[in-house]
Amino acid sequence: MYKRQAYTGEEILRMLDFTLAQFKSRGFGVPKTFCAGFYTTSLELQNKIALKGFTSSAAAFPPGKEVGSQYSPSWHELAGWDTSVTIRSVPYRISKTTILPTGTLPFIQTVDGNPLVEIPQNCKIDWMVTAEDMKMIINHHVQFAKKGRSTAVCLAIHEGSADRYFTKFNDVLEYVDDLSENRNAQVKVRYATVSQVRAKFIEHWK
């Protein structure tokens, strides 16, 4: 029988320090977004990335079967994700008591004095969904926006999968291009970095 044992806070800090040192040695600044495998995420990790200068996380993942393929339950159960994370999830502030979107005050604070924000991988990841699945998820969020709800879609694409799934990704991105270029659309669809999405949501929450 195996016993699950998470990384300690000290171990997490050592790994983060190593990662940040690699960025610094190559002349880059401090990265702002941390994407942990959703199954390795924990409150300990979220607190430590906030301490080290990260302002956003991209780990929340829909465990359900509503759209596309599904990981085995053990993957999301390791971290504590549940069906409160769906393809309809939107960015949220991370609570000090849970990594789930159901969390409430107090929130984990970052070095800029604002909350650590989770950007859910609401479009699942590259191999799990078809182009039509991804377009359908995008359309859900467009409808949210038409009702006045702030939202964002995270297209999670692994660098190593870009060539293998090029046709699918190209189809989806062309679809997004068409939405963003439609001057008569009821809502504006635009590409944005995680930092830009976080800034807009913080402004919205205020």
Model-derived regions: residue spans:
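Metal-dependent polysaccharide deacetylase catalytic core of the NodB/CE4 family, i.e.
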Residues: 3-43, 60-69, 73, 123, ...
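A structural motif corresponding to the C-terminal end of an alpha-helix
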Residues: 18-29, 107-116, 147-148, 179-187
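Glutamate identity and glutamate-enriched acidic tracts
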Residues: 10-11, 44, 66, 77, ...
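Short amphipathic alpha-helical segments and helix-helix/interface helices
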Residues: 20, 46-47, 173, 177
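Active-site-adjacent pocket scaffolds in enzyme catalytic domains
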Residues: 35-149
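C-terminal domain-boundary segment and adjacent tail
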Residues: 56, 61, 131-206
